[in-house]
């Protein structure tokens, strides 16, 4: 069965053309899916014949709430979703004065091996499809009744280890016929996968890149974050600089301020010791 919600509007138009339908139907189907339709039977402006064709060849992803916890302190809601294959992921909805931010997962599990992260214990099970990332935003908004204005890819998984599906998700959630959440309202957090950062820079998107350091020196970082053994922090700073040059968007991080100064001072000391200008 085809995962129709992971299709772009253009792909959907071509798919419907192959089914013998006019391509303008794609916009109708796309709109229904991005409003949270769980069944083709809900798509009342489609013919019964077309709905039957789609039901016979396509599936609509939709997660089920396993657990929902809401903080009485600040209204934060934590969701545990069950996907259609039985795997589970987490999503968190946070309230701020500037709007509602949803933190979504990009994979089932993670293979990055960071010592402080529980989601990597069982390793990476599989990547999430674009539709499954979109569903977290869409169904969190529908279930909570709160309009989502910002997205953070900082949940389970390393987004740049699933870069193609993440890129497609970004296009879907940003689409004017969908949820239309602006790129400047989206942040992507990475532990430092440099090829992924460079790939992202080539897309010239206006999202914010958030880099997790978690250590004030490269030796400590390598001990708690295996990714640093492959892509050390000096290379990471250089990749972030190239990202800024390509996009004009700074790279940030929840833990970057405290560690970054120490790391930069260390880099400067090493340069001075080597006699570099």
Task: Label every model-predicted segment.
Residues 1-87, 238-277:
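Auxiliary Fe-S-binding modules of radical SAM enzymes
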Residues 121-150:
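Conserved alpha-helical substructure of the radical SAM core
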Residues 95-132:
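Canonical Radical SAM [4Fe-4S] cluster-binding loop centered on the CxxxCxxC motif
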Residues 139-150, 155-253:
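Conserved AdoMet/S-adenosylmethionine-binding subsite of the radical SAM
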Residues 129, 162-166, 259:
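Residues at alpha-helix caps and immediate loop-helix transition turns in enzyme cores, especially N-
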